[in-house]
């Protein structure tokens, strides 16, 4: 039986007086791609920020490999093997591609940096071609690849991705999702937050639907892909 890598246990998260995430619980098992889908403002990004240690739940808990990471600093969570690809990419614009990748490896032994970088360059040949280019001069799609590559540099067991298709052309969206599939084949477990519900459900094993801060549906991704309520609300069908 696959190990439960991540367990979100009945968390409640507030922004001031705004109750953004309400009694949310779900699990991500080793080897899975799990997706959270929902409209803008549903609480998806807030949930990911809570998992990554950028926000703290008022009640409830977040467990990684069976241990609570509630209140643990974000960089310690990365050291434990849980990396994030944030919404909007957030690459270091005035640093080169290679320097950005090196920043992703700050928690790793020096001996692992070169082999991990080669793994990234195999996944993203364009990054290898542009390794000396400033990140700020790259296209949005290239910056997204760099953000994903930087996460891989920390040798994670689990990567949480926040809206990786945001702002990208349809062609680049296809490319990014293809790369997510390849990352999964390399043994990386993935928690994916994505507004493009059709693409997310097509690639995921399981899915949860967030509405107004609550999980309203869950199940196999293929089942939800063909569910009439999901199709009407999120797939334009």
Spans of features found by a protein language model:
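Glycine-rich phosphate-binding loops of nucleotide-dependent enzymes
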Residues: 2-237
């Amino acid at each position: 039986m696959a190990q439960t890598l991540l367990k979100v246990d009945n968390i409640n998260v507030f922004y001031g007086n705004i109750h953004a995430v309400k009694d949310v619980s779900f699990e991500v098992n080793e080897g899975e791609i799990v997706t959270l889908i929902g409209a803008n403002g549903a609480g998806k990004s807030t949930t990911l920020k809570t998992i990554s240690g950028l926000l703290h739940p008022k009640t409830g808990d977040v467990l990684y490999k069976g241990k609570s990471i509630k209140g643990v600093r974000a960089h310690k969570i990365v050291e434990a093997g849980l990396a994030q690809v944030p919404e909007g990419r957030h690459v270091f614009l005035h640093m080169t591609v290679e320097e950005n990748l090196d920043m992703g490896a700050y928690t790793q032994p020096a001996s692992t940096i070169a082999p991990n970088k080669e793994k990234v360059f195999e996944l993203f040949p364009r990054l290898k071609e542009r390794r000396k280019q400033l990140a700020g001069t790259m296209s949005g799609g290239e910056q997204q690849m760099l953000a994903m590559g930087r996460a891989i540099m920390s040798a994670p067991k689990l990567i949480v991705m926040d809206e990786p298709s945001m702002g990208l052309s349809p062609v680049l969206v296809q490319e990014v999702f293809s790369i997510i599939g390849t990352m999964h084949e390399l043994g990386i477990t993935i928690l994916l937050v994505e507004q493009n519900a059709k693409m997310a459900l097509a690639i995921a094993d399981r899915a949860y639907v967030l509405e107004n801060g609550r999980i309203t549906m869950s199940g196999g991704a293929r089942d939800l892909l063909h569910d009439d309520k999901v199709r009407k609300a999120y797939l334009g069908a």
